[in-house]
Amino acid sequence: VSRVALGMMSYGAPSALSWSLDRDRAEPIVRRAVEAGVTFFDTADMYGDGASEKVTGRLLRALFARRDDYVLATKVYYPMGPGPNDGGLSRKHIMSAVDASLTRLGTDHIDLYQVHRWDAETPIEETMAALDDLVRAGKVRYAGASLMYAWQFAKAQHAAERHGLTRFVSMQTRFNLLYREEEREMLPLCADQRVGVLPYSPLARGVLAATGPRDTDRAAAERGRSRLTDGDDAVIGALRAIAAERGLPPAQIAMAWTLAHPAVSASMVGATRTGHVDDAVAAVDVALTPEEKSRLEEHYRPRAPYGHT
């Protein structure tokens, strides 16, 4: 797959999210990504209550000549209706959810079907068996996971191995210069088990892309949720200093740092402008020196993990 994956959460539901784009506004951005060599696209059934999957499917069918020329990923877990079986990772929900996603995406298979969260209410053996059945049926090519604690991910992999079921091939998790808690256990676990890590939010929702005090809408929202601390200012300062020395946007330096981790296979990137795509693709070719990496990392202060539940 391409080392940049275009996250499709930003497309399909402008009425629900102020920063979401409709199909017409999303088309030139996705087209720019395709022209730049991006072949990996990630969405979820709950993004825009299914609207993102619909837009994703329509755009990719229009921009690619063959279905085999791109990798399509989506996710399952969050409620998609009011009923007791309309969410979670039970066999019943997974089996109905995958068919609904296939219909919205307009395809006969999903390349990477990811569980969006850990489901404490469903035995992991039931979840892994359902995913294995989807792979055997040809509806899904590979199974992936997202946002778990390392012990949960290890438990899932062990359950699959113990019962001869399909194992997860990927872990999508938060990882950037301002949130590095996954370096403790998850990234080493994935490296040891040869599982591809797919970091999302490499720019901390736009905070690391800013060149000055003016925030993006999502960066302002992040500050409003108290995710950022005063200690992050030193990291941001080092990032901007290195970017200035290189004559590059801070976004390229921040994404280059994420991509440089040996466990990372591809980075999930959201884009609401074509320039966001350009920065992400250019970051693939940015090689940071050991001294630059040290400067970017030395000011980090550990924090409590979040986002797994």
Per-segment meaning from a language model:
Residues L102-T122:
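Active-site groove signature of glycoside hydrolases
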Residues S18-R25, A51, V55, N85-H93, ...:
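Alpha-helix N-cap and loop-to-helix initiation/capping positions
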Residues V1-Y70:
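N-terminal binding-site loop/beta-alpha segment at the start of enzyme catalytic domains
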Residues V1-L17, A73-D86, H109, Q114:
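N-terminal small/glycine-rich loop or linker at the start of catalytic domains
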